[in-house]
Amino acid sequence: MTQIELIQQRLGESIAVKQQLLEDKQLMQTLARLADAIARCLNAGGKLVICGNGGSASDALHFAGEIVGRFQKERRAWPAVVLNADVASMTAIANDYGYAEVFARQAEAHLKPEDMFIGISTSGNSENVYRALLKAKELGAWTACLVGRDGGRIGRESDYPIIVPCQVTARVQECHITIIHILCEMVENMLTNPERDE
């Protein structure tokens, strides 16, 4: 395979997965419901608490950056906490309790019932994200996830599971960042134009 053929193949694969999402009516409905829930959470004074590992950790940071800063519209800052950003807490918890607890322990510290927990995991089975999700549910917070494959344990336990049904991590991550941008646009539209007819 030539370099050009590789480029064409990977772009084609990425388009194909996104086309699959575009045709998934249930996903569209869940995504719209999640955007509405995020808007209600933020409007009521709640915050987003987000986490992931590796590339998903970067997606969590990106998501929070769009929420705290802005996506496209000039508006007030909204609160978002990224659990994988706090290196001191993560390493302290990993040292004392093990890596599986690095997010759950922080979730216990940060989450309140009016908040929303969003876990990002391409497999849907990351143990530390799963434990944080369970802690969020225990605390009465709303739960959502961006996952891949069949959704895994995280997808099954979330109030708002956004599942990219693909086995290839890179393709799932490409869809996740697109979904994050769509969510940010929808939330900004709802909170800056609250009377707009959806």
Question: Which residues fall in each region the model found?
Answer:
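Generic N-terminal amphipathic, Lys/Arg-enriched alpha-helix
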Residues: 1-26
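Short, structured helix-loop boundary elements
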Residues: 4, 28-31, 80, 100
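Structured helix-beta-strand junction loops
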Residues: 17, 44-45, 157
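A short, well-structured juxtamembrane/interface segment
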Residues: 23-44
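Conserved hydrophobic/aromatic pocket- or pore-lining residues that grip, position, or stack substrates
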Residues: 38, 52, 67
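Glycine/serine-rich anion-binding loops at beta->alpha junctions
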Residues: 47-63
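Glycine-rich phosphate-binding loops that contact phosphosugars or nucleotide phosphates
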Residues: 61-197
